[in-house]
Amino acid sequence: MNYEIVVGLEVHCQLNTESKAFCGCSATFGKAANTNVCPVCLALPGALPVLNARVVEDAVKLGLATNCTIARHSIMARKNYFYPDLPKGYQISQFEEPICSEGMIHVELEEGRKDVRLVRIHIEEDAGKSIHDIGDDTYIDVNRCGVPLLEIVSYPDMRTPKEASAYLQKLRQIVKYLGISDGNMEEGSLRCDANVSVRPVGATEYGTRTEIKNMNSFRNVERAIEYEAKRHIEVIEGGGVIVQETRLWDADKLETRSMRGKEHAHDYRYFPDPDLVPVLVDDGMMHRMREELPEFPEDRAARFVSEFGIPAYDAGVITVERELADYFEATVNVSGDAKASSNWVMGEVMRTLKEKYLDIHEFAILPERLGGLIKLIGAGAISNTIAKQVFEIMQQDEATAEEIVKREGLAQVSDTGAIEAAIKEILDANQKQLEQYRSGKTQLFGFFVGQCMQKMKGKANPKVVNEILKKLLDA
């Protein structure tokens, strides 16, 4: 029997607000344990929460960006459960009246576009963190308590691990473009739980699902879903029954293991939080949030193609990250050459970022400086080879490309007399290759070009070299 996989994702997106969701404590990641905490975080007697307005605005932005219906009136609820890293004994969340519902995310796949429906987006606060890797004891860090989250719940519309990964990547791209989260999965800014089931191809009823946690990369999301689906099929075909439960993904062993029985909504005894007033979204906020929406990747890529004339592939790569697209556009404004700019951004810039584990905002060469370098190439002042040398120097030096070229004596040589003299010396020193070329082995042309560039330390104008070399070889 053939089976199809059915996947729905629950994604927790940590917002990059300065303060927490319901108090003034810092929401910064990486502080010393138990230092970003106050009576509100711990729900001490008499401490009252106040909802951070920025959290509501970010929720509305994400709702608009994902084609959701925005609730003009929603309520905060208490989700009651016991866990050592939840000192309140409950988590402030939303249940019956979420702020956003019934949305859609369009995901581009190799085989075409996939539309993934959203059940809801709701506001909630994060819990603390249990630390198990210090000796034999378990420690609790409550810094994360109260950090604002948006939970994005999809319908079970995905049918393969790759679709789930692509959906998650698209969601990450959206929150980063909006500027509401850094989307860092390794630091927990974007956490994903997958609900996985299988059913016979053609069936309309869903199978029993299991929830998978602890997937901290797109690759692990794919691996975990693939493993769990295979496990389901093996259990079913072996005559067993799938137990509805929560399972933990073990990235070292590449397997899931049982964590606990899957809870139902009634297990959490949700009820409206009596300390918080309803969340109201008026026309003014809706208008402001719409005005603040950025130009999204698909629209920006289309504009880059039509306005700058770069290939659709280049535009797609450059617009994956908003900051990279900003960098490219600023570079073009200086260089005046969009195609050369896209080549440099996709080539040397992205290579350097990858090698040095940098984000574009950490890159030493600002777009104005890169644009200046590209402008020198276009003007014939330096060759591409020299430009790469200058590019490396610019990463350690705050001088402009033009200043470096002058200081290091790297200006391109276009003097026909000097180039012709160098070529004649090379031909005299390589008589055997010269005879072979004139006997029909024309691929040696590249050999002579290389010899000339080497002799002139890469500073010879390639166009002039080619013209003079061809004239002398054919003489």
Swiss-Prot record:
GO terms of biological process kind: glutaminyl-tRNAGln biosynthesis via transamidation; translation
Entry keyword ATP-binding: yes
Ranges that cross the membrane: none
Keyword tags: ATP-binding, Ligase, Nucleotide-binding, Protein biosynthesis
Gene3D superfamilies, per database record: 1.10.10.410, GatB domain, N-terminal subdomain
GO molecular function: asparaginyl-tRNA synthase (glutamine-hydrolyzing) activity; ATP binding; glutaminyl-tRNA synthase (glutamine-hydrolyzing) activity
Keyword Nucleotide-binding included in the entry's annotation: yes
EC code(s) of this entry: 6.3.5.-
Source taxon at top rank: Bacteria
InterPro entries membership: Asn/Gln-tRNA_amidoTrfase_suB/E, Asn/Gln-tRNA_Trfase_suB/E_cat, Asn/Gln_amidotransferase, Asn/Gln_tRNA_amidoTrase-B-like, GatB, GatB_C_1, GatB_Yqey_C_2, Gln-tRNA_amidoTrfase_suB_CS
Catalytic reactions on record: L-glutamyl-tRNA(Gln) + L-glutamine + ATP + H2O = L-glutaminyl-tRNA(Gln) + L-glutamate + ADP + phosphate + H(+); L-aspartyl-tRNA(Asn) + L-glutamine + ATP + H2O = L-asparaginyl-tRNA(Asn) + L-glutamate + ADP + phosphate + 2 H(+)
PANTHER family: GLUTAMYL-TRNA GLN AMIDOTRANSFERASE SUBUNIT B MITOCHONDRIAL AND PROKARYOTIC PET112-RELATED, GLUTAMYL-TRNA(GLN) AMIDOTRANSFERASE SUBUNIT B, MITOCHONDRIAL
NCBIfam families: gatB (TIGR00133), PRK05477.1-2 (NF004012), PRK05477.1-4 (NF004014), PRK05477.1-5 (NF004015)
Biological role stated in the UniProt entry: Allows the formation of correctly charged Asn-tRNA(Asn) or Gln-tRNA(Gln) through the transamidation of misacylated Asp-tRNA(Asn) or Glu-tRNA(Gln) in organisms which lack either or both of asparaginyl-tRNA or glutaminyl-tRNA synthetases. The reaction takes place in the presence of glutamine and ATP through an activated phospho-Asp-tRNA(Asn) or phospho-Glu-tRNA(Gln).
Quaternary data: Heterotrimer of A, B and C subunits.
The family this protein is said to belong to: Belongs to the GatB/GatE family. GatB subfamily.
Name of the protein this chain belongs to: Aspartyl/glutamyl-tRNA(Asn/Gln) amidotransferase subunit B
Record organism: Chlorobaculum parvum (strain DSM 263 / NCIMB 8327)
